[in-house]
A protein has these predicted regions:
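Substrate-recognition/cap helix-loop segment adjacent to the acidic, metal-dependent catalytic center
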Residues: 99-123
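A short coil-to-beta-strand element that immediately follows conserved catalytic motifs
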Residues: 34-37, 120-124
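Amphipathic alpha-helical interaction segments
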Residues: 86, 90, 111-115, 139
């Protein structure tokens, strides 16, 4: 089984309103050796206004998020293609189940793509935040 460690940057800190503007992922083998790397950024859709909180968290600015080469939809097509290419895998992130997965699902759904890509068709998901919480609870 392979592992995909991934993270997103968005224009909002709320899952209901967030739009992905950047995604980074690393494919690891069973021994946690890097096999592939993927990073993609898009320009923010013109109908969106980024939250100041998100810009601070992302260490970004309006120029950076409005001048990408890819449209938001083109970026999602590339993400879907890469995640399917890397499947089956366990998708890992930090706070990914409560934020990243939710935002990705909503973005895929709005773009008429399969929203549950990270936990169907042999894929599974896990959240490093839950591992940290469990370790803290045991200690």
């Amino acid at each position: 089984m392979s592992y995909v460690v991934w993270d997103i940057e968005t224009d909002s800190a709320q899952t209901d309103w967030a739009t992905i503007i950047e995604l980074g992922a690393i494919l690891l083998d069973d021994n946690f050796k890097e096999k592939d790397r993927f990073s993609v950024r898009c320009r923010m859709p013109q109908d969106r206004v980024p939250s100041a909180t998100a810009l601070c968290i992302n260490k970004s600015n309006v120029d950076l998020i409005t001048k990408g080469n890819l449209s938001h939809y083109e970026m999602l097509v590339q993400v879907e293609k890469k995640f399917r290419e890397w499947s089956p895998a366990t998708f890992l992130g930090y706070s990914s189940i409560n934020f990243d997965d939710e935002v990705l699902r909503k973005e895929f759904f709005k773009s008429l793509k399969k929203p549950y890509l990270t936990n169907t068709e042999g894929n599974s998901r896990h959240d490093a935040l839950n591992i940290v919480k469990a370790a803290f609870a045991i200690d």
